[in-house]
A protein has these predicted regions:
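Active-site loop/oxyanion-hole signature of alpha/beta-hydrolase fold enzymes
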Residues: 50-90
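Flexible "cap/lid" loop of the alpha/beta hydrolase fold
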Residues: 99-107, 111-145
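Active-site nucleophile elbow and catalytic-triad environment of alpha/beta-hydrolase enzymes
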Residues: 167-183
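Short beta-strand/loop motif that positions the catalytic acidic residue
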Residues: 187, 193-195, 199
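Conserved alpha/beta-hydrolase "nucleophile elbow" surrounding the catalytic nucleophile
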Residues: 28, 89, 93-95
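Catalytic active-site module of serine/aspartate enzymes centered on a nucleophile-bearing elbow/loop
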Residues: 221-250
Length: 250
């Protein structure tokens, strides 16, 4: 198992395949293990890297998670790139990981070849969606299948991980709000936005409004909304998603 040091804590990462570096970024309450089914499709031609953000998966735990969570996670991605000596990378972010990927592209434009941002909430936190997340996780912890999945992702302390994540999400919505420190007009690399029209996490029409908003701010953005499939779209529409990514990155 591979780790690198980040501000006194160990971050877990894995590498598969050869070629240009392509980093896959997991979402909230998940870990890099979520990408197990999709990695083989990308590792044929790319040097695929996955990582567990601090507090998640096989990375070190934190006594308290940062409030500006996704911005902080973007710094961890760049720290991994510095550690490995990656000058230019491709990024695929899923859900919360998509917010991280966009933050990296906005804050470190010289490090990015292209980005895919899949199934994410928006430009700023929504109070109604945040409350839905909080309530949904509370009840989900009573679901045996959900609990088993999280134990695979994080280990025996999965419930503490979920609670810490939820606390950070709620605190961010209350005290920070914005997911990004810079406007999309400052993007300097191609970004593909993807989501499913049937995503159960968000209201109907969520992605149409969000993607129109982003694409109106920058010529670097393109979008695709899958007609069917649950959250996240990259897993529920895997084959089509992979094909679109290969066209972007190859």
């Amino acid at each position: 198992m591979s780790y690198f040091d980040y501000e006194g804590n160990r971050i877990f990462y894995e590498e598969i395949g050869e070629g240009k570096p392509l980093i896959l970024l997991h979402g909230n309450t998940a870990s890099s293990k979520m990408f197990t089914p999709i990695i083989p499709f990308f590792s044929e031609k790319h040097h695929v890297i996955t990582m567990d953000f601090l507090g998640c998966g096989q990375s070190d735990r934190l006594s308290k998670w940062p409030t500006d969570l996704w911005y902080e996670w973007s710094r961890q991605v760049v720290a991994l790139c510095d550690y490995k000596g990656f000058e230019k990378i491709g990024l695929i972010g899923c859900s919360g990981g998509a917010i991280v990927a966009i933050n990296v592209a906005l804050e470190y434009p010289d490090r990015i070849n292209a980005v895919v941002a899949d199934s994410f909430e928006g430009i700023k936190a929504s109070s109604s969606i945040t409350e839905q997340i909080r309530i949904g996780r509370h009840y989900a912890k009573q679901n045996e299948e959900f609990c088993s999945m999280l134990k695979v992702m994080h280990g025996d302390d999965w419930e503490k991980v979920v609670d810490a994540d939820t606390e950070a999400v709620v605190n961010h919505a209350k005290t920070v709000g914005a997911f990004f420190h810079r406007p999309f007009s400052e993007l300097q690399s191609k970004i593909l936005l993807t989501g499913s029209a049937e995503d159960e996490m968000f209201p109907k029409g969520h992605y149409e409004k969000l993607f129109y908003n982003i694409c109106s701010q920058t010529s670097f953005a393109e979008s695709h909304i899958f007609e069917h499939g649950g959250h996240p779209a990259m897993m529920s529409n895997m084959q089509e998603f992979v094909s679109m990514c290969k066209e972007l990155f190859d």
